[in-house]
Amino acid sequence: PYQTNCYAVINPETHEGFVVDPGMGAAPQVRELFAQHQARLSAVVLTHGHLDHIRDAAELGVEVFIHPEDAFMLNAGGGLPEHSRLLFDASSMAAPDSITHLRHGESIEFAGYEFAVQHAPGHSPGSVLLIADELVFSGDVIFRGSIGRTDLPFSDQAAMTESLRGPVRDLDDSLAVLPGHGPTTTMRVERATNPFLREANTDRIHGGA
């Protein structure tokens, strides 16, 4: 319903892969994609715990990775407004069979690709950046020209400001940014044009899209 971006990564050498943020309706498409490529899905990786990013995580039947501060949301969309839970039919959600917590500062491998985990709260308590050599999965921390909302339950505008001042600001300009919604961008472009990032050293940060 919210046009969430779901990313699938398949290692062509090992035919193993993972998906990032499988929202509502993603599971059948993910299964079809992996079948077409004769690949094995080994992990679901979540940038945060909002329903539009996690709805089909358990349906894929593999290990689910999420920051511990958002793990409670895997329980039928815990912590979100009732209208969101109804929109995503949260009452019918199954909890994942196996959950691994993403820890700030750790390096973790998915399907042969290394990612650094950077905690970047604000949009949600457990939002993370997943940083590789050439790209970052930014979830709803930063989008092209905007940032994640901070008017939701468990959002925190002050924490978002600090994330923009620290973890986001520190990302290398060369990185491609693969956000949770909207088109891809680069850190170089966002540093030059994103008004929320540019104002991150002031107190005038407001939630964007």
Feature names for model-found ranges:
Residues 10, 103, 109, 121, ...:
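Residue-level detector of conserved, well-ordered beta-strand and adjacent loop positions
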Residues 25, 39, 79-84, 113-209:
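Metallo-beta-lactamase
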Residues 18, 45, 109, 118-119:
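Residue in the alpha/beta-hydrolase core beta-strand immediately N-terminal to the catalytic nucleophile
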Residues 7, 100, 105-106, 128, ...:
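Residue-level detector of beta-strand structural context in well-folded domains
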Residues 24-109, 192-200:
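Active-site HxH/HxHxD metal-binding segment of metal-dependent hydrolases
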Residues 1-37, 129-139:
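Conserved beta-strand hairpin/beta-sheet module of binuclear metal-dependent hydrolase folds
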